[in-house]
Amino acid sequence: MNITRRKLIQSTAITAAATAAPIKLVYGQSAEFTYKFANNVPLTHPVNVRAKAAADAIRNETNGRLDIQIFPSSQLGSDTDTLSQLRSGGVEFFTLSGLILSTLVPAAALSGVGFAFSDYPAVWKAMDGELGTYIRAQIAKANLVAMDKIWDNGFRQTTTSSKPITSPADLRGLKIRVPVSPMWASMFKAFDSAPASVNASEMYTALQTKVVDAQENPLSVVSLFKLNEVQKYCSQTNHMWDGFWFLANRRAWERLPVPLREIAAKHLNAAAMSQRSDMATLNSSLQQDLTGKGMVFNTLATDAFRDKLRTAGYYAEWKAKFGAEAWAILERSVGTLG
């Protein structure tokens, strides 16, 4: 099963319809356990395509005892609201970006440290290994259960209107839109950029009117927001990677008999592996499509960017915030940062 750009873009209409009423993708007759799975991506996003397949498989293998209903597109509230519902038990399952989860579990932001990962093999080695194990243990302290396999949210790329980014010097003085996050702001300040927080809904206009000259996001966001219309260059900086943790309310999870838990975990983790592959295919097709629309792509070596962050004190700042133990685990996974 391939997730194509066309399917992703078609989500616009589906998302609008989804806000009107809950979408129950799995139906059943008096399931013993009916659990809600909330997320913030459209129905046709690889997360929901694979979650739907997993929910079907779980229902079939449990003989209808566990019925997982999917609520896409932030239908049950904002990320902050839904995280609160997950903690209270109002929602049983939720996929959430590690960088957003870090508001509750600071260690979850470890995977988003600037230029920590050189490529996807490095990501999966760390997140399926010691680093992922450490972060899941910290998540458990918040009374949440994280599935073993994290889902892919993607590497973030940098788009600009005037020139490609080829070295840290190209970021100097650049007015760049970033999310409201200390990690993003401190990284671009370390590059001597001028980061500005702009809501996603206002991003296109801000770029069009030159309030900001650049932005950074995964390619899926560049495509969905049609940023190629106001941005000429896309530099594949891969400066941050982020994933979706598949989270469960601990009480709800432990309410399931052990055999049902094992079945659910098996299919959810398998779905994560398939979704990772889907995202790789999607990103490749998005680059081809955006190139066809006139966007100019370039790749770059990242060593100079790491060196700049090191000398600017960015890594030292975040090592102090995360603590020596967490930082040592990160560096064992990705190599010495600073």
Report each predicted region and the residues it spans:
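N-terminal secretory/targeting leader peptides
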Residues: 2-122, 130-131, 137-338
